[in-house]
Amino acid sequence: MKIGIFDPYTDDVGGGERYMLTIASCLAKEHSVDLFWDNKTDVKRIEERFSLNLSKINLVKNIFNGSVSFKDKILTTKKYDSLVFLSDGSIPFVLSKKLFLHIQQPITSISISSKDKLKLRRVNKIFVNSSFTKGL
């Protein structure tokens, strides 16, 4: 299975990055995993700080940084069986077969536009860190 991972905060080298790249590392044991990020140094810092083995994760061009055209982003995401996306409050429009959205802020505090409601239909699962984040 071909899986893409995106964390817009990869350069923060914090707990969320540990969480996302631990997921990537686990998935890479049995699947082909690509991390959408342009700076290898950031990934190396995460690997060292959190003692993660990221050797099986492929670093690929960050198509979510705004410099890639909508068409190119869509065509690239279509090549993936699954995408795991750490949301910065946005919901991506992608054409992967499956989309998993990780949210780190309380869902009740996120305003969802009509456009986002349409994009949510493509999300297979939303996962959160805690009951607090879920807004319970």
Model segments located where?
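Extreme N-terminal starter segment of soluble prokaryotic enzymes
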Residues: 1-4
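A short, glycine/small-residue-rich beta-strand->loop->alpha-helix junction that serves as a flexible
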Residues: 6-21
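Short, solvent-exposed loop/turn segments at secondary-structure junctions
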Residues: 9-11, 39-43, 88-91, 105-108, ...
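A short, Lys/Arg-enriched amphipathic alpha-helix followed by its capping loop at the start of a domain
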Residues: 23-31
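Active-site donor-binding segments of glycosyltransferases and PAPS-dependent sulfotransferases
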Residues: 33-90
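Active-site regions of enzymes building and remodeling cell-envelope glycoconjugates
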Residues: 49-62, 95-105, 123-124
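Membrane-proximal helix-turn-helix segments that form the acceptor-binding/catalytic region
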Residues: 74, 107-127, 132-136
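Active-site proximal beta-strand in glycosyltransferases
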Residues: 82-89, 93-112, 127
